[in-house]
Regions:
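CheY-like receiver
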Residues: 2-3, 7-12, 138-151
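Short acidic/polar segment at the start of the alpha1 helix of CheY-like receiver
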Residues: 22-28, 70, 100
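Short amphipathic alpha-helix used as the core "switch/output" element in two-component signaling
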Residues: 52, 74-89
């Protein structure tokens, strides 16, 4: 379950929480992130644990498969819980989806997902989306955030 990554060296690392029940998918994400000493991959095998870790560990970004139910909770229910909680309401959540038709992407974004990434997970689109999410999180969590002033 919890943090799997390279040993900590240097400054604090950004945390990515991956909510995924299949070990082979987690292994793929680990392989894609293996060279990134600035990232720590946290893993939750079900949505309930994912919510607990999102609240307690406050990851900078979350990745979840949108096409499956994780322990009886859909990804859409998962995002509703996160968006209703002040501690997680602005955390960027990346949706990993088999269905990337325009209508499905619009539905995911309207539900509160930050971005949709096509399955299977591929290095370039995944890293591009993740880096954008981490930049957003850095601004969102910074002391000076002009977006917070307008809320």
């Amino acid at each position: 379950m919890i943090a799997r990554a390279v040993p900590k060296t240097g400054p604090r690392r950004s945390r990515l929480l991956y909510v995924e029940e299949h070990a082979e998918n987690v292994a793929l994400a680990e392989a894609l992130l293996a060279g990134r000493k600035d990232l720590l991959l946290l893993h939750a095998a079900d949505a309930n644990l994912g919510i607990k870790l999102a609240r307690s560990r406050r990851p900078e970004a979350i990745l979840i498969g949108i096409d499956v139910d994780l322990a009886g909770m859909s990804a859409l229910e998962f995002i509703k819980v996160l968006r209703a909680d002040p501690a997680t309401e602005t955390t960027p959540v990346l949706a990993l989806a088999a269905d990337t038709a325009p209508g499905a992407i619009v539905k995911a974004l309207e539900a509160g997902f930050f971005q949709v990434i096509a399955k299977p997970l591929q290095a370039a689109p995944f890293m591009e989306a993740l880096l954008f999410a981490l930049e957003f999180a850095a601004v969102e969590r910074s002391e000076y955030n002009p977006l917070k002033e307008s809320r």
